[in-house]
Every structure is written in C-alpha cells, then in structure tokens.
From Swiss-Prot:
Name of protein: Endonuclease segA
Known function: Probably involved in the movement of the endonuclease-encoding DNA.
Keywords: Endonuclease, Hydrolase, Magnesium, Nuclease
Organism: Enterobacteria phage T4 (Bacteriophage T4)
Organism lineage: Viruses, Duplodnaviria, Heunggongvirae, Uroviricota, Caudoviricetes
InterPro entries from the UniProt entry: GIY-YIG_endonuc, GIY-YIG_endonuc_sf, NUMOD3
Names of required cofactors: Mg(2+)
Chain intervals with Basic and acidic residues compositional bias: 138-150
Entry annotated with the keyword Electron transport: no
Gene: segA
Chain segments carrying region Disordered: 137-164
Superkingdom assignment: Viruses
Residue span(s) of domain GIY-YIG: 8-91
Pfam families referenced in this protein's UniProt entry, alphabetically: GIY-YIG, NUMOD3
C-alpha cells in the first residue's frame, strides 16, 4: 500500500452549492492553503460544471496534525446517512479512501451513482489528465482574497477543531436547545440535525462540529 506523503496542512471541509444548498464533505492535504482546491467528488465536479465554480463556497471545518487524523474526522462527518441524503454530493462514506465495501446504499444513492456515471469517460487515467491540466495555473487575486476571508472567518481556525461560540452566537449560545432537538430526533446525523435546526429557526449552516460536541468527540472553547 502506497504511503501518504505528509503535507503541512491537513483539514476537513464542506463545500456548499449557493444555488441549491447541496453540500459536499471532504478532506484535503496541502503545503499551500491558496492552492485553489475545491473538492474532487464526481457529482461535485458535474455540479460545478453546470452551475459554475463561482457558485460554490468552501469552508474549512478543522485542521489536523496529520492526514490520518483528517481522515478519521471525515469518517465522523460522512456517514451512511450523509451518503444516502439527496442534498449531498458525497457518494462514499468518509475515512475509507474511496472504498464502498461493507455498507448498503439506498435507492437514492444508487440513483446518485448512476447519474455520476453517465457520460463518464471509460479510459483509465482520465482523472490524472484533469489534475495535470490544472498544474501551473495561477489563482486570481479575487480567488486568493476569497480563500483568505474564508480562513479568517473560519469559526474553528487553527484551534484543532474546537468550536467557539464567539463566531456564531445564534448557534452556539443556543447549543442546549439544539442539543434537545438532536436528542428528541433520536440523536440523528449532521444532515438531519441541520434540517431540524433550520425548521426551528436556527441558521442555515453546518452543524457537524456541534454534533461532535454532543457526541463528546470535540470540546467547546
């Protein structure tokens, strides 16, 4: 098995389609935070082609000491419930390096996979060709400014995934109310919790980090 070469930064992220609010969770390892990375999922790539890259926003959820730790965090984020949710672009559970072994997908996920395969080139090496085509491309000042702003506004910053109530008081000052919603829903996953929270009048944002606080895998600053 090929050993992963460690990079300076390892993080989990969520990409949001600003047109239809669909999301995609993932991990990235890089030596340059301004490398222009915007996810690599099959459905996500198709959506970016359809709606335009400018209509997608990437938010960093948390930084980790190494790639394995980031993968472990991704496993917590991308559960089978997330994969089966029609409002996500994720086709595989997280933390497994792309393997689909050992879990059963819903009819919704099968449909997502089917759509992802339509029109897909059959020859091997296509993804490598696409990646190489991006090498050497310079990022515009506007793109760099947007990524810098995203990092500065990241509520988790470089504090190793410890959420802070200071950045979004509407969410974090009401954490007990949202926890009650979570418990009453049978301790649902991040996607369902988000839907329930929005229905209760809370912000349309990711509740993945808050969910980890509820489960005891993350601490609140």
């Amino acid at each position: 098995m090929k050993r992963h070469k460690e990079k300076k930064y390892n993080y989990t992220y969520v990409i949001t389609n600003l047109v239809n609010n669909k999301i995609y969770y993932g991990t990235h390892s890089t030596d340059d935070l301004n490398d222009g990375y915007m996810g690599s999922g099959t459905l996500l790539a198709q959506a970016k082609k359809k709606y335009g890259k400018k209509n997608f926003n990437l938010s960093i959820l948390g930084f980790y000491k190494d790639f394995k730790s980031a993968r472990d965090a991704e496993r917590e984020l991308v559960t089978i419930d997330v994969v089966n949710d029609p409002m996500t672009y994720n086709l595989k559970i997280g933390g497994e390096g792309g393997r689909r072994i050992g879990y059963r997908v819903s009819s919704e996920t099968k449909e997502k996979i089917s759509k992802a395969q339509k029109g897909k080139p059959k020859h091997l090496g296509f993804s490598d060709v696409c990646r190489k085509a991006q090498l050497g491309k310079k990022q515009s000042e506007e793109t760099k400014a947007k990524r810098k702003e995203a990092l500065l506004n990241n509520p988790y910053g470089y504090n190793r995934n410890k959420p802070s109530h200071k950045r979004d008081p509407i969410m974090w000052d009401n954490i007990e109310k949202i926890k009650e919603i979570w418990e009453n829903s049978g301790k649902s996953g991040a996607i369902k919790l988000k839907k329930l929270a929005i229905e209760a009048g809370f912000p349309n944002k990711s509740y993945a980090r808050m969910l980890e606080v509820f489960r005891g895998t993350r601490t609140l600053l």
